[in-house]
Every structure is written in structure tokens, then in C-alpha cells.
């Protein structure tokens, strides 16, 4: 089962999104950026983060920058959940590595579709990496055989 973390200081929003996702996904939550970093330490198998942009202390944008600079967490997809509007906000988010945006209040069907799309993209990336490694191994083996046959 895929694992998703919701990071939002609004406890009601967390509860609503969690209820929408739990039948299909394992869901953990954090109410601050600092709590999110702690949860990341405990849950290295996270697949996706739903991240509020505006939180006290550590903002969602700052947390995104930390995640994308980390070797351990840079591949986790991040979808911003925000009440902020404007192209500048989205440009900053995408520039810093956000996977997508979703406007609050969240539409349940759109949320599920965006999550599934990001998880599908992750699966394709993982398959691509596996195929690249297999291809490199085969290429090395072919080189080895050629060197044995044609000294």
C-alpha cells in the first residue's frame, strides 16, 4: 500500500483529507514542518506528501526546498494544498520541485486523480531506472564477450 503524508496546521483539513484517502492509502500526518521532518525520519518509505503552503514556523515552501536538497527525500512527490492563488505562487513551487498544486477547499475526486497520477509517474521512473541498470549490465556483458572472442 502506498504511503502518503499530509502536512497541514489545520487539524480539520488533515482529518478530512485523511478520511478521503485512508481506504486506499496508508496515511500519516504532521501539523508543522518540524513534525513533518520527524515523520520523514520515522517513515522512509513515504511515496507522496500533501503539503500546505502556509503554516506557522516552517512554511511549506521552505520544507519543499529542504526535501528537494536531501538525497533521501528528493524523489518524494509533493503536491501543494493551498488557499493561496496566483501564477507567482505556482511558479515558485514548480521551480523548487513541487509536483502539482491543488486549491483548497479540496475536491475529493481531483485529489485522488492527482495523487494517482503522481504515483504512476513514480512507478514509471522506478521502472525506467531498473531498465537502465539492466541495460548497463547487458552492455557490460556484451563488452566482456567481445573482449573474450576478439582479443
Sequence positions of predicted segments:
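C-terminal output/effector regions of signal-responsive regulators
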Residues: 126, 130-151
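C-terminal output helix
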Residues: 89, 105-115
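Two-component/phosphorelay signaling modules centered on CheY-like receiver
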Residues: 11-29
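Acidic, metal-coordinating helix/loop segments flanking the phosphotransfer/catalytic sites
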Residues: 29-48
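The feature encodes the CheY-like receiver
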Residues: 14, 56-57, 74, 82, ...
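Receiver (REC) domain active-site loop signature in two-component systems and cognate sites
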Residues: 55, 93
Amino acid at each position: 500500500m502506498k504511503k502518503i503524508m499530509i502536512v497541514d496546521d489545520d487539524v480539520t483539513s488533515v482529518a478530512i483529507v485523511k478520511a478521503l484517502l485512508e481506504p486506499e492509502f496508508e496515511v500519516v500526518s504532521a501539523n508543522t514542518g518540524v513534525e513533518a521532518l520527524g515523520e520523514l525520519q520515522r517513515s522512509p518509505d513515504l511515496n507522496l506528501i500533501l503539503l500546505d503552503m502556509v503554516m506557522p514556523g516552517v512554511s511549506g515552501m521552505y520544507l519543499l526546498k529542504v526535501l528537494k536538497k536531501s538525497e533521501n527525500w528528493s524523489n518524494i512527490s509533493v503536491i501543494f494544498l493551498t488557499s493561496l492563488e496566483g501564477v507567482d505562487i505556482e511558479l515558485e513551487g514548480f521551480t523548487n520541485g513541487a509536483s502539482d498544486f491543488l486549491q483548497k477547499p479540496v475536491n475529493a475526486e481531483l485529489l485522488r486523480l492527482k495523487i494517482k497520477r503522481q504515483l504512476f509517474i513514480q512507478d514509471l521512473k522506478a521502472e525506467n531506472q531498473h531498465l537502465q541498470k539492466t541495460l548497463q549490465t547487458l552492455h557490460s556483458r556484451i563488452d566482456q564477450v567481445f573482449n573474450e572472442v576478439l582479443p
